[in-house]
């Protein structure tokens, strides 16, 4: 057989990179992420390999499942939207499912798989070959690819997690009542985080402080 020609795309730039695969699947690559896939997908499946973080909007094709493999886990889908992060030295892979359904299995446990539902986060750990699943807000995990931050009556606790991911900053919120306080707003992600926090502060009872190490305390 003729060897399969592979395409390797690495995001060495300073902005999120968007790809359109031949099957109409859309992929957003986070900075430093690398994806490898065949120049032409086989007839029965659509395999890609990921190192780093990416968001997938997979085109629906029941006859050819789409699979994303990382060092820790393989994710099998038919058509769905989800975020995969294997950036943490490859030994841990996080999968946040926005819509559709995916099945995860680890190479060491070929006959065991975990099926995810929308609104869940799965964490696959290579060291003990385990997959844990918990409920989450998938937007927290895919916000890095958006140009705008949109909050619709969301609790401040969730908003701060989104801002942490979007800006790569440690935010500590030590007030349980404030965590549950809902806020609605829309911000361009090009805005400095101080501007966003100041606007939220003006419309809620929240106060914030930026520390010398860049972390932020909320009370």
Can you say where each PLM-predicted feature lies in the sequence?
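A residue-level detector for the "anchor" residue at the start of short, highly conserved motifs
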Residues: 1-219
């Amino acid at each position: 057989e003729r060897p399969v020609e592979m395409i390797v795309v690495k995001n060495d730039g300073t902005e999120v990179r968007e790809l359109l695969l031949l099957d109409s699947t859309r992929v957003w690559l986070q900075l430093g992420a690398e994806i490898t896939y065949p120049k032409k997908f086989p007839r029965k499946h659509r395999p890609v390999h990921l190192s780093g973080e990416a968001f997938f909007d997979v085109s629906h094709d029941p006859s050819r499942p789409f699979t994303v493999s990382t060092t820790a886990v393989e994710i099998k889908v038919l058509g769905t939207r989800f975020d995969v992060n294997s950036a943490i030295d490859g030994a841990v892979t996080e999968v946040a499912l926005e819509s559709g359904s995916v099945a995860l299995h680890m190479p060491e446990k070929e006959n065991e798989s975990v099926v995810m539902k929308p609104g869940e986060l799965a964490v696959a750990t290579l060291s003990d070959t385990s997959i844990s699943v918990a409920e989450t807000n998938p937007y927290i995990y895919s916000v890095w690819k958006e140009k705008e931050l949109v909050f619709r009556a969301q609790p401040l606790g969730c908003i701060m997690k989104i801002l942490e991911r979007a800006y790569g900053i440690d935010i500590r919120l030590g007030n349980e009542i404030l965590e549950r306080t809902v806020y609605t707003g829309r911000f361009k992600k090009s805005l400095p985080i101080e501007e966003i926090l100041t606007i939220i502060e003006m419309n809620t009872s929240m106060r914030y402080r930026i520390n010398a190490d860049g972390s932020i305390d909320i009370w």
